[in-house]
Amino acid sequence: MEKKNRVFGVIGIKAEMANWNADFNGDPKNTPDGTIFGSDKSLKYAIKQQWLENGEKVLMVKTKKIEKGNLLVNNLEERYTKLFGKIDTKNNIEVLENLFKAIDTLTFGAAFAVKKTNHSITGAVQINQGFNKYEDTNIITQDILSPFANSNAEGNAQATIGKMVHVDEAHYCYGFSVNPTVYAEYKALFGENFEGYTEEAYEKFKEAALTAVTGLNSAAKGGCINEYAIFINLKEGSRKMLPKFDTFVTVEKEDKVIVNINKAKNLLEAYKNEIENIEIYYDDELTEVDYSALTEEIKELIKEKI
């Protein structure tokens, strides 16, 4: 079934003694002024991994093959062929139809350029950069010792010493938007053969947005969890575009982590007639969401999912 309403909100990721998104030097990504952030790709990676584990068709993901005794990475054409069969360069529309059968392409869009086939799809779901909202974050560097000798050391007698960089605690806040109307052109093109962005696809995105990071299992991301999420559901037919909601979020820590959205009071008041409801997800053992300054009319729209 086609999704007919827009959604705006935030996804909160907590990193504790972990490195949620490293740069090429292995350090947590940061802006020139030192603000730590995570790219949209890091969150999309987690979501795609969960979809893969659930048996969904995922196109834009790194996969590997063994060729002539070597472990290699598949190119885009090979990944497409694995999912949909050989590309028919004489049937450009068939390729486009297949792209929308992959959950990640349907959700996030894709740039597909293989042989004579070129498609650029703007996804219904857009995720922004996720900035750390916690002011007391420290970056920690640890020396780590490999159990193996350093092949470059004289006499090969020295063990390899490396480093592991992580944050003691950070709270990343990703703004996102869901706009099903971006596929109106393709719906007109394909007619009844294409529903556009569906409720089923949205629910799969929503489930992954709430759980995918917690499910990651690696040395760097083992301390990263889904901390909270807020979904502002507009009414069906509303064409309003809300500003990035992450700019209205602050994070502090007392006995619990306090996620404060009171700065959004004027914004939510201005759009209240366009809003169907506001869903807030969090673990109340660890987190508290403060919206005490919002008007009673806005509070009535809030549904807490603890």
Language-model features, listed with the residues they occupy:
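RNA-binding basic/glycine-rich loop and surface signature characteristic of RAMP-family CRISPR effectors
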Residues: 1-306
